[in-house]
Curated annotation (Swiss-Prot):
Organism annotation: Burkholderia cenocepacia (strain ATCC BAA-245 / DSM 16553 / LMG 16656 / NCTC 13227 / J2315 / CF5610) (Burkholderia cepacia (strain J2315))
Biological function: Bifunctional enzyme with both catalase and broad-spectrum peroxidase activity. Shows peroxidase specificity towards odianisidine, ABTS and pyrogallol, but methoxyphenol and 2-chloronaphthol are not peroxidized.
Site of covalent link Tryptophyl-tyrosyl-methioninium (Trp-Tyr) (with M-253): 91-227
The name this protein goes by in its record: Catalase-peroxidase 2
Family: Belongs to the peroxidase family. Peroxidase/catalase subfamily.
Keywords of the record: Heme, Hydrogen peroxide, Iron, Metal-binding, Oxidoreductase, Peroxidase
Active site: 92
């Protein structure tokens, strides 16, 4: 008898010990291939903008409004209205955004996937999305989950008597979890011990609290929280100390003090928290729950497990006497009572009004009234002197408060969408806001092919080198972040503060190049009939392309770098210098630049930069190899310029790096290397970790071998030009 059927089969394919188990520090090249077409179930030609614009938005709003009071037995609505639940859902979808790297936020519908779908701060939002499913099912691909989550929050506010500032669609769904977002290093939910620099070496962005400095780019105080611990720092119920955390994390998502107060007070005008019983009644999160739960989690064994017995945060607080109607109840209670510390039924720190009458409605029993309660972080708005002044001003001026909350809510839910050019739908507000990084509309006739050729000739005859032309264009365009769609060449903000002064851009050399290009621009524009002009933003990109064409010609290749005019020049008044400061790269491996020394190796920072530029591993490889031989570097060092003919577009970088006649040894620690002739010991090249990784990492070496091969040069030039044009056009949403 065969034993075949009795052999154990313990592990599925793809399981077992992985490369990352063996080598935990392996380079995360997989980050450059996430969200590929292989994970997208929609047809290759599907155009979301067209689909959204065909949507009957009014009908959808009516369906959502009807849902608000259509309480379901399987998950009853608090106070008979789902509005507060959906406000929380939208808030938590958008609230993961952080301005440090632009990641997180509502833009890709990631609340559906791990880890966000299983964060402790998102308990019960699995039910909110299931309540929405019949409506999503009805409208199909005309609205993404990402857009629907935010629209539902907007409708929820409207049905509770609040006038919102506007709504824009345009968020396209992804179909798998993000892998590029760093949420922290803790390995336990609600852990926070690893994200704070206890010695104070890290500098806080928004004021001092010695020994409590949050790691960049994180914008939450504990693993699995959206912002702060509502019980206070590390559970310490100190409203003043909590104000520090609030200011820090809200600041990291681009909110100032007024916006912060407006969001907290406005959001807490509605609904309640849930802590009906001890947390040990709550089961596993969705990602760990059994198949039979069908993607739901946190099954609650306390009482009925729902309604009045719901457990989410463990806090049991209702802020207002009118929790499903916009009003000033939050401020009225906050300043109308003195508060004493108590504990929720689940044992969490919260506050109850002293000497108060029960005025707060019960969420599921109209015959009952409760005492007013608050969170520690609510009291921060009263006991922090800055927040208190703003709060009292809002309390005394309800219209000012309503406008501030409307604007802050719109910013919260649209901050990661990028410029207004990406906004879809009839409800887009007409007012232009500084945080949208506004760029003027095109107001002139654009240049055409008959203008481009002589302009290139003028540029190449200007005395500027290939390296200067290419590096300036790269500096302008490579600020783009695919995370929140900020930055890029459009606007020519390379000539404005703060970008013109960034060390990576070599301000003196940049000023020299810009002066020449501005002269060429002025001479061209002053001689054109019919209102034809070229913006400096366009000219910078055109000049970079001209430099590449010249470098390719020197290598014996005639190429044309595609150029699409249509960029405009922003003004300093349209540029929030503080907001743009976060776009300054701490490292740009494409220019062999690292600003200081970091625990993260330079090659990992290159991957991070490439991922923000939406590049694939082959595109990154082609760009690094090309920029090196074009001598596009920050500073005077020639690290990685593995060629005897710089500013010529060759495959020398790859061929010389892979040449076994060269032996590499580290110098100056681990970050710089010498390449010497293996036989004579003669110094041939110097390189950085970013340079050598293309020969060291097995995957990058395989890609480099393609270009280093005898038949690789023509392909390399094609690939380099294509990747270059991609970066130059990343912010050209009008070309999509």
């Amino acid at each position: 008898m065969s034993n075949e059927g009795q052999c154990p089969f313990n592990h599925a394919n793809g399981g077992g010990t992985t490369n990352r188990d063996w080598w935990p520090n392996e380079l995360r090249l997989d980050l450059l291939s996430q969200h590929s077409s292989k994970t997208d179930p929609l047809d290759p030609g599907f155009n979301y903008a067209e689909a959204f614009n065909s949507l009957d938005l009014d009908a959808l709003r009516k369906d959502l409004a009807a849902l608000m009071t259509d309480s379901q037995d399987w998950w009853p609505a608090d106070f008979g209205h789902y509005g507060p639940l959906f406000v929380r859902m939208a808030w938590h979808s958008a609230g993961t955004y952080r301005m440090g790297d632009g990641r997180g936020g509502a833009g890709r519908g990631q609340q559906r996937f791990a880890p966000l779908n299983s964060w402790p701060d998102n308990v019960s939002l699995d039910k909110a999305r299931r309540l929405l499913w019949p409506i999503k099912q009805k409208y199909g691909q005309k609205i993404s989950w990402a857009d629907l989550l935010i629209l539902t929050g907007d409708v929820a506010l409207t049905t509770m008597g609040f006038k919102t500032f506007g709504y824009a669609g345009g968020r396209e769904d992804t179909w798998e979890p993000d892998r590029d977002v760093y949420w922290g290093s803790e390995t336990t939910w609600l852990g926070g011990d690893l994200r704070y620099d206890k010695g104070g070496a890290c500098e806080s962005q928004h004021g001092g609290n010695a020994g409590r400095n949050l790691e960049n780019p994180l914008a939450a105080v504990q693993m699995g929280l959206i912002y702060v611990n509502p019980e206070g720092p590390d559970g310490n119920p100190d409203p003043v100390a909590a104000a520090y955390d609030i200011r820090e994390v809200f600041g990291r998502m681009a909110m100032n003090d007024e916006e912060t107060v407006a969001l907290i007070a406005g959001g807490h005008a509605f609904g309640k928290t849930h802590g009906a019983g001890p947390a040990d009644n709550v089961g596993l999160e969705p990602e760990a729950a059994g198949l039979e739960q069908q993607g739901l989690g946190w099954k609650n064994s306390f009482g009925t497990g729902k309604g009045a017995d719901t457990i989410t945060s463990g806090l049991e607080v209702t802020w207002s006497d009118t929790p499903t109607q916009w009003g000033m109840g939050f401020f009225k209670n906050l300043f109308g009572y003195e508060w004493e510390l108590t504990k929720s039924p689940a044992g969490a720190h919260q506050w109850v009004a002293k000497n108060a009458e029960p005025t707060i409605p019960h969420a599921h029993d109209p015959s009952k009234k409760l005492l007013p309660t608050m969170l520690t972080t609510d009291l921060s708005l009263r006991f922090d002197p800055v927040y208190e002044k703003i709060s009292r001003h809002f309390m005394d001026n309800p219209d000012v408060f309503a406008d501030a909350f409307a604007r802050a809510w719109f910013k919260l839910t649209h901050r990661d969408m990028g410029p207004r050019a990406r906004y879809l739908g009839p409800d887009v507000p007409t007012e232009e806001l500084i945080w949208q990084d506004p760029i003027p509309a095109v107001d002139h006739v654009l240049v055409d092919d008959t203008d481009v050729a002589p302009l290139k000739e003028t540029i190449l005859a200007s005395g500027l080198s290939v390296a200067e032309l290419v590096s300036t264009a790269w500096a302008s365009a490579s600020t783009f972040r695919g995370s929140d769609k900020r930055g890029g060449a459009n606007g020519a903000r390379i000539r404005l503060a703060p970008q013109k002064d960034w060390a990576v851009n070599e301000p003196a050399r940049l000023a020299k190049v810009l002066k020449v290009l501005e002269r060429i621009q002025g001479e061209f524009n002053s001689t054109q009939p019919g209102g034809k002009k070229i913006s400096l933003a366009d000219l910078i990109v055109l000049a970079g392309g001209a430099g590449i064409e010249q470098a390719a010609k020197r290598a014996g290749h005639d190429v044309v770098v595609p150029f699409a005019p249509g960029r405009m020049d922003a003004s300093q008044e349209q540029t929030d210098a503080h907001s743009f400061a976060v776009l300054e790269p701490v490292a740009d491996g494409f220019r062999n630049f690292v600003k200081g020394k970091f625990a993260v190796p330079a090659e990992a920072l290159l991957i991070d930069k490439a991922q923000l530029l939406t590049l694939t591993a082959p595109q990154m490889t082609a760009l690094v190899g090309g920029l090196r031989v074009l001598n596009v570097q920050t500073g005077d060092e020639k690290h990685g310029v593995f060629t005897d003919q710089p500013e010529t577009l060759t495959v020398d970088f790859f061929r010389n790096l892979l040449d076994m006649a060269t032996e590499w040894k580290p110098i100056a620690g681990e970050d710089t290397y010498e390449g010497r002739d293996r036989r004579t010991g003669e110094l041939k090249w110097t390189g950085t970790r970013v340079d050598l990784v293309f020969g060291s990492n097995a995957v990058l070496r395989a890609l480099s071998e393609v270009y280093a091969s005898a038949d690789g040069e023509a392909k390399f030039i094609r690939d380099f030009v294509a990747a270059w044009v991609k970066v130059m056009n990343l912010d050209r949403f009008d070309l999509a």
